[in-house]
Amino acid sequence: MSWRNHRAPAHPGRRRGAGPSARRRMVVVVGLLSLVSVGLVARAFDLQVVRKQFYQRQGDARFLREMPIPVSRGTIFDRNGEPLAVSTPMMSIWANPAEVLDSDERIPALAQALGVDADSLKAQLAQRSDREFVYLRRQMAPAAAQAVLDLGIPGINGQREFKRYYPSGEVTAHVLGFTNIDDRGQEGLELAYDDWLAGKPGAKRVIRDRMGHVVEDLEQVRAPKPGQNLTLSIDRRIQFLAYSELKNALEKSQADSGSIAVLDVKTGEVLAMANLPTYNPNALGGSRPGQRRNRAMTDVLEPGSTIKPVLMAAALSSGKYTPTSPIIDTTGGHWYFQGHDIHDTHNYGLLTPTGVITKSSNVGAAHIAMTLDTALMYDTYRAFGFGNSTESGFPGEAAGSLRIGRSWRPLEKAILGYGYGLNVTVLQLVNAYATIADGGVMHSPSFIKGGDATSKQIISPEVAGQLLRMMETVTGPGSTGTLARIANYSVAGKTGTAHKASIGGYAKSNYTSAFAGIVPASNPRLAAVVVIDNPQKGSYYGGTVSGPVFSRVMEGALRLLDVPPDNIGRWYVGGPLQGTGLVGAQPPVDAPIDDAPVDEDTP
């Protein structure tokens, strides 16, 4: 074979006709790789530049959270620094329902730790699965809440909160009020001073892990402002005493309700205010709306004979009367005026103005009222605060009612002289007596220590002094308020027994029994009013039912405040005049006596 015709064997790694095809394939591969690279670069550009903020927000939404920084509500103290309302740290458990449902096999353990039914808990989570925050249980004890968190269930978290606690419970309930589960004031001084006490929660930005636990605090968004403390005018010792004596009186008389208020006459500070029935603010679930009402502030009553010192203030100011003159004829204990029988419980014959106070004569008071200028009488009642709010700042305070003087009909004017035809609150009444006690200076009642600087002279010091001496006779022998006496102290006061209004007139057997007084009479320090509503057992007279409560509370308060005894051992000359020229022998006084209303058809 010729070597020219010989063909060398093909190279084992070379294929025929591969040149152009290989290049085409190479181009395709390179093109695809280039497209992939461009896509990756574009995606990276989209992630890092175009949609960077969107994805960052999405990531933050999963792991970056703004959490509240809870603040403690301010503590409420009594005037001596004793705590009346404090905030205790608690823990609330909340959940992200969707995350918890992903571990639904652990729901029974969660339910057991929370103290709830497992099926109910699962249903609750399912119903709210579209939310990211749902409370499972509020205000748990920290140890119990930590036991829930220790289960390590995804989506279960804790939030620190505070719960209000009232050490004195029902004793101070009506004054303090209470807060709701979010620690905001709902009634009483908790509501009145809510902004002061609540403070403002702060906020911080944190990073949470997938279990919801905080792994890092990033920054404080808003600084917390804790609530400020509040010091009240209330003296816890006197408050306990007032509450205890009021409770004993209601149990003894089987009355429907009762109220007592004690004021410092020099400042207008409320030292004690108690009502029954009451409630426990630490266990609101068992209370009724009627139990939560501060009756001394929100309820009104016809004051009955406790208004007579105010009538006498107008009489003395008019210049027509002095404590001993003129002589008033009570016309045998009955005065038939415009077809109505205004009557006393006894025939007192001839009385001085002081005697009208001593014996609580309705006939005498009505006669005095009808001799006074209507404008003067109305202005005096109004100046003493009747028909006006005391502006104490207490939520829901009633203003009472007093018709404008020019609209008074003669009969209306007569019965206004002994406390019918107007409505007052217990606070208004005790403030009126405190005004007499402080030389005719009226202070705005205050629940805050230090009192209110607002004051005004409404009657002259001379008239106020005369009224005090006239009112001292009420606790003297043969008068209506002997049971309100206090050993070694002089007492100026006034009893009041009023029929309660009912449909069509006045109820024959339902009474409001009251005593209002000032101690010591020679140098007044305290004024107090006790009102017992509808006593059903024993006597219903104000001097008999409410007088002893006043006596025991004031005796204890004077001792607690270190007020020295005055024990003046004298009585202002007043009461029924003796002598053949004026009146025969007076009937014996078998029991404390008081007023009665006109006939029940009185308008």
Outline where the language-model segments fall.
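Periplasmic/cell-envelope proteins involved in peptidoglycan metabolism and beta-lactam response
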Residues: 1-284, 375-385, 506, 533, ...
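Beta-lactam-recognizing serine transpeptidase/beta-lactamase-like catalytic domain environment
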Residues: 4-7, 85, 208-221, 260, ...
